[in-house]
Amino acid sequence: MTSSYDFAILGAGIAGVSAAYFLSKSAKVALIEREDSWGYHASGRSAAVFIEGYENPTVSELTLKSKNFFVEATNIFSDYPIIKPLGGLTVVPTTKLDEATVFLDRWRKLNPGLALIDKSVAMMRVPILRAEEVAGAIWDPNLLSIDTHQLMQSLLRAFFSNGGQLLCGKDAQLQRRQAGQVWEIDAQDLSIRTPTVINAAGAWANEVALMA
């Protein structure tokens, strides 16, 4: 049986599920997963957090732009909050105090709530710390926990409501691109045609890329 889609996404982890949800608002989408269930690998086993000051300014800016989505998700498609206040503490060893100051100078521009707390406050928050090794800690009051399973389940429910198709247990193979316009995907008992393939295969992304 051959089916046609506007987009075929390979990999039903958080990247693939997110892309599937947003694209399904205005397009016909197939989400194809090799395992027997979605979120089988890293996406289903992660303790996720929302960190405003993370990695580099570009990543931080993208993170901040996505915050409203997480905040408003309960009103859009989720019965329960996707994010909850958590707070994050980064321990500053006695040998790294100067580096902590540099870090704060860099990241406070994007996350003004960051603060250097002294050893006594850090020890009160995390009593198991070794006092002789700790100079203090950087406290991030804006760090949030993300309910990964709730997020993915909510995205998938909305994806299904939009008419999206989830195909699990399909070891998809890219066969050819006909006339430079249409990808042909062999998904075992299914044949899928699409002008656009999205590689969301995570750790297997290189394998998918080589098929193209």
What is the predicted function of each stretch?
Residues L10, E52, N199-A200:
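Redox-cofactor binding/interface segments in oxidoreductases and associated redox assembly factors
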Residues A15, S37, W204:
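Conserved Rossmann-like nucleotide-cofactor binding loop
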Residues A47-R125:
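Dinucleotide-binding Rossmann-like beta1-alpha1 core, especially the glycine-rich loop
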Residues Y80-T90, F103-L104, L110, L116-K119, ...:
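Helix-loop-beta segment of a Rossmann-like dinucleotide-binding subdomain
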Residues I138-T196, A200-E207:
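Helical element adjacent to the flavin cofactor pocket in flavoenzyme catalytic cores
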Residues S24-S43:
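Glycine-rich FAD pyrophosphate-binding loop
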